[in-house]
């Protein structure tokens, strides 16, 4: 049941045990459009809704509304949401939260295990931006993201994604529900 709820869709023709051998994956993560400067809150909402839908107990994981999430994350110190606030908010809901400097192999590893990631993208001097990575497609050399400022399943050129991600020191957040036992990622995020 969990496998069908995760709705992993293979984008390529091969599916191997090694995430590096696959042509691509996509996770059906619900989309939430952001209000001004609330990409972090929208990203948290997407992650919470994803795990709510994927829960084997029929959605027993409670999902706060987007306005409640935004209120819980709003900062008087910044025009947006700090990554540390997202981590603390998810932890307050008893999620297992890991923030780490990601690498491309981390994206492939976690997505192939049914775990969407929130990543920070640099914006050339403007405010940084959070998106939810939902997949990748090697033949097209793209990363699939839910961009709360734009739309679901936005295709980003992998090279441009990497450059933008590096502007935030490859900031990555993995949030797992309390019902999912998991060991902490290693120092390289796995």
Q: Where are these predicted regions, by residue range?
A:
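Bacterial N-terminal signal peptides
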Residues: 2-13
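Conserved active-site-adjacent core of cysteine acyl-enzyme catalytic domains
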Residues: 15-30, 48, 61-189
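N-terminal targeting signals for Sec/Tat export/insertion, comprising classic cleavable signal peptides
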Residues: 26-54
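Phosphate-handling active-site elements
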Residues: 54-60
């Amino acid at each position: 049941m969990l496998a069908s709820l995760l709705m992993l869709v293979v984008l390529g023709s091969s599916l191997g045990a090694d995430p590096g051998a696959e042509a691509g994956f996509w996770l059906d993560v619900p989309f939430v459009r952001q209000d001004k400067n609330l990409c972090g809150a929208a990203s948290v909402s997407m992650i919470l809704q994803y795990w709510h839908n994927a829960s084997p107990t029929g959605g027993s994981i409670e999902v706060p509304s987007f306005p409640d999430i935004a209120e819980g994350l709003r900062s008087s110190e910044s025009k947006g949401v700090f990554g540390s606030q997202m981590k603390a908010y998810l932890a307050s809901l008893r999620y297992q939260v890991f923030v780490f400097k990601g690498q491309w192999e981390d994206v492939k590893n976690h997505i192939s295990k049914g775990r969407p990631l929130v990543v920070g993208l640099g914006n050339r001097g403007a405010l940084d931006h959070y998106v939810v990575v939902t997949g990748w497609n090697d033949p097209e050399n793209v990363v699939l993201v839910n961009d709360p400022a734009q739309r679901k399943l936005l295709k980003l050129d992998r090279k441009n994604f990497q450059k933008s991600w590096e502007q935030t020191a490859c900031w990555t957040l993995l949030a797992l529900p309390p019902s999912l036992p998991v060991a902490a990622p290693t120092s390289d995020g796995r």
